[in-house]
Amino acid sequence: MVYTEGDINLVNTCLTCNYIYLDTKERKKFAQSSHEYLIQQLQINNYPIQGNTSIPLTFNHPVKELMWLLQSDSVLQVNELLNFSGQKKYIANSLPSNLKYNQFLRPHLLDKAKLTLNGQDRTDWHDYNYFYYVQNYESFRNCAEHFAYIYSFSLNPWNLLQPSGSLNFSRIDNASLSIKVNKDKVNTLNPAIIYIYAVNYNVLRIQSGMGGLKFAN
């Protein structure tokens, strides 16, 4: 299989929805009552990187888990928008005759990482295996090849109905994620972008036909 460069054009999109219809009495009761729902939100920090660095985490609210992905410019240049490894997915049109045995292995862009809160290390330096394999298995029983690194503050982050732990970033003055990268894949000649996601809890209030969040940023 070969790759070809070119823009990705969305020809058509659709949205699938589920509707719940209420009868007149139920609709009146629902409209006149106040409601509070525990919801989850997603916060995102994106930063360009060219080597080892410390990235400030500007999040708010009780966060149940952090997830981050690194993406090199080399894969973006061939429009592999969902490739977060250090190797293009597809083979080039022309190949040299002296290929190495590991030519098409997909290495990780992350080497090591640690999390720091208010000047105190929440974690020691761990290599990517800890955040990729151990945290994925402990939190989600997941070993898919997605190149997403995770750190969970919750015992069961997959449980959407019952929180089991979080870190209130609104009470943290300084939080940072320090990373060491695979220098063969991320450097000044081949920079990358790190995408950091935080899943947090909030409360959605609905009253008198109006909705809003209980806790603002």
Language-model features: locations:
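Flexible assembly/topogenesis modules
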Residues: 1-217
